Amino acid sequence: MVVGEVAVETQVAVIGGGPGGYVCAIRLAQLGKQVMLVERDPEGIGGICLNHGCIPSKALIHASNLMDSMAHLKEMGINDSGVSIDANKMQEWKGGIVKTLRKGVEELCKRNGVEIVFGEAHFESSRRVGISGNHEVAAIEFQQAVVATGSVPVELKALPFDGKRIISSTESLQLREIPKELIVVGSGYIGIENGTMYAKFGSKVKMVEKAGNILPGLERDVVLIVEKRLKELGVELYTGTEIAGWKEENGKIVLSGTQNGKPITISGDKVLVSVGRKPNAESLRLQNTNVQQDERGFIKVNEKLQTTDNRIYAIGDVVGGAMLAHKAFMEGKVVAGVIAGGTAAYQNRAIPAVVFCDPEIAYVGISETEAITKGMKVKIGKIPFSALGRAHTMENVLGFVKVIADFDSDVLLGVEIVGAGASDLISEAALAIEMGARLEDLALTIHPHPTLPEGLVEAAEAAMGKAIHFYSKKS
């Protein structure tokens, strides 16, 4: 390695070590390319997902679910002696999981021949990036580059982050004291997940949403199931509410705004602002390249994820679309194939999405509403979880499985699941859609009994008018 101001040369520079970046770097190395992976987080690679998002949040959600389940033990004949939370111990446990996975990813990079460079990258030209904060590498000259810098939380002017009282999703996963009253502004998937989690930990949660209902954009029948459960957990829902400002009063944060046009105040100990994310591209100095961005700052790419500068590619949150780690995984593999000389192209056909609330939500393909809006003629099959024996044995009968299929061909177009284990069930649906499966392909596949995946069989049969374990009158 060259030390000082002389640039290091590599075939491909990957900027950002999150899900898209490290997967792309490893696959490039597997395909014979010399790769340098630049990561600005001194703690290690993994990005928001591994360090401050997907992994730590699911660990804490798992802990909250275990705590919530304790409330139902007596119904099963199990007597408990009471449960309490040690938030510091919980953070140590969560941190251990993150550290283990991060070390594992770094080791995979090294074993595959990916060189990791810690520092912040910025473009000096379409062939060179400068590196700040690294004493060994000042710059990297590349033949191709991949931008995988992810996204950052959107900040509201009325509620600027201070990292202590008004926090983002990052800080919400690092709290060493469970807040007595937590206000969650924004009821998208991050807000819903965090709000549900803290409600189970014992916080009085107040959820604020500008739209007319929580989880805007999702099907109403899905949302109603989650609303019911949130109310059971004591969560207060303030829909149609817009926050204009805040003040501190008697040790509390008091938000002021309007709900459906009428003045309202909401008080709490902490405020989690979760109103979306924006591309993390401001420090890249893209003006030194031919890379173009759209009006929202997302990097423009074609079907090969190539930017308007033909030497530079971009993947993951920074290009927009569904901000999902598994989407970034696939984009990283596609770009690696393209750079290595393949003919791969990115196709957004079946990207599953999951909300780890209670009950879980998972969906893939088109929704029933989307199909109707597009004037498509479809078949719908819907089975409640209460029709599944396994759901009863788990004390989780809230929810349903819905399939959407083309009316004439029976080709599967979409699946929506709300219920226990939805995050695991959706993968079979994604595979079915990706392979162009028809309703009978699901219906005729023998599923073990009693299991939750039987819901997919029953829903497919319902769409065909042949459901066994659920009766609905034929229209």
Task: Give the location of each predicted region.
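Glycine-rich dinucleotide-binding loop and its adjacent helix/turn
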Residues: 54, 149-204, 208, 233-237, ...
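Short hydrophobic core segments
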Residues: 13-15, 121, 140-150, 185, ...
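Flexible, glycine-rich terminal cap/loop adjacent to redox cofactors
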Residues: 15-43, 48, 55, 59-66, ...
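Short glycine/serine/threonine-rich phosphate/pyrophosphate-binding segments
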Residues: 20-24, 166, 191-194, 200, ...
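FAD-site-proximal beta/loop scaffold in flavoenzymes
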Residues: 162-179, 265-339, 432
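Beta1/beta-strand and adjacent pyrophosphate-binding region of the FAD-binding site
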Residues: 6-18, 178-185
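Glycine-rich flavin
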Residues: 2-10, 27-178, 211-215, 221-222, ...
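Conserved phosphate-binding and hydrolysis motifs of nucleotide-dependent enzymes
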Residues: 16-21, 150, 186-191, 276, ...
